[in-house]
């Protein structure tokens, strides 16, 4: 299975990079992982809604360039569906069983995802109603993907 994580912005903090590297290493046993970072646009202070939408559109266009036609796209969105870790593992397994061997997870920037990206998504997923820094969220997503594969393989880890 091929899994891409397409996210806005670069990871700067060493502790987050270390966690991403660790989960990437762990996931190499289960899938081919590709982490893609697209540039984030600077948001001016007191930006209008129109300015924010333009920024999301620019970031969205960069994201869409990295999504393959055959990808099952899962957008991480506050308005998405909240599911358990078991349901998440079922979602990944159902992709595989229905011939979707390529999953693209999309993490937006500080303003979220553009309408174009959300409309391309096959599934909208929310981890919580709370807001998280998108850099930290990448680690959380990798951990849940790793947990999902451990669940699917019946291996100890999930508790």
UniProtKB/Swiss-Prot annotation:
GO terms for cellular component: cytoplasm. Keywords: Cytoplasm, Methyltransferase, rRNA processing, S-adenosyl-L-methionine, Transferase. Pfam families: SPOUT_MTase. It is an enzyme of class 2 (transferase). Its main location: cytoplasm. The keyword Transferase applies. S-adenosyl-L-methionine binds at residues 76, 108, 127-132. InterPro entries: Alpha/beta_knot_MTases, RlmH-like, tRNA_m1G_MTases_N. Its EC number is 2.1.1.177. One of its GO terms (molecular function) is rRNA (pseudouridine-N3-)-methyltransferase activity. It catalyses: pseudouridine(1915) in 23S rRNA + S-adenosyl-L-methionine = N(3)-methylpseudouridine(1915) in 23S rRNA + S-adenosyl-L-homocysteine + H(+). It is found in: Cytoplasm. CDD domains: RlmH-like. Specifically methylates the pseudouridine at position 1915 (m3Psi1915) in 23S rRNA. Homodimer. Belongs to the RNA methyltransferase RlmH family. This is Ribosomal RNA large subunit methyltransferase H. The gene is rlmH.
